[in-house]
């Protein structure tokens, strides 16, 4: 996958390109990350990249010309080799909230360009003419789009074949099937008097699978019940969830 970044602070993306799973993916050429700084497209000696908003008000906007030129340069670079255009995404609090389904959809793209805003945002006309989609990582405001962009890259990279040791790791993560992840355990067998669930050491794969599914359903129902509203549960999942609710009700009735 190729990802282009439009940012006033491209150095921040060393956290993605130089470290961890994504850094390894870059070294293996499974993920290519290329940055453009709008400051490099300015025409004045001060390299100005902000401008006043029409209508007044607090704050500044990103200057149109350097930002647009940077985006267009990234677009041209994206399709230079094979003619495949990149989807251009603006990280914005007004965008669609990023979730696992969205991550999986974005991961199907060969190329993405991520535009990181600063100040109070960017000119609406640039959104209309240069941006394909707006995405948000949550209902809160940050000082820029770099951290949301890194979050998106990290999440999407997990679905690039070869990035994870086992591709099933991405498929078994929290939200991969709409459910929260089950609990995980490693050595020692007993930690501060708390033992590993016996079923996980039984070697019985079907029992382990069923236990993990039950734990995922229980955790989702207790912590994020709204996630269950949009799921089409299997017969097995419905039976397990009903049993979980009955046991929970029984325990509460005794307390």
UniProtKB/Swiss-Prot annotation:
This is tRNA (guanine-N(1)-)-methyltransferase. Disulfide bonds: none annotated. Keywords: Cytoplasm, Methyltransferase, S-adenosyl-L-methionine, Transferase, tRNA processing. InterPro entries: Alpha/beta_knot_MTases, tRNA_m1G_MeTrfase_C_sf, tRNA_m1G_MeTrfase_TrmD, tRNA_m1G_MTases_N, tRNA_MeTrfase_TRMD/TRM10. Belongs to the RNA methyltransferase TrmD family. PANTHER family: TRNA (GUANINE-N(1)-)-METHYLTRANSFERASE (PTHR46417:SF1). Its EC number is 2.1.1.228. Its main location: cytoplasm. GO terms for biological process: tRNA N1-guanine methylation. Homodimer.
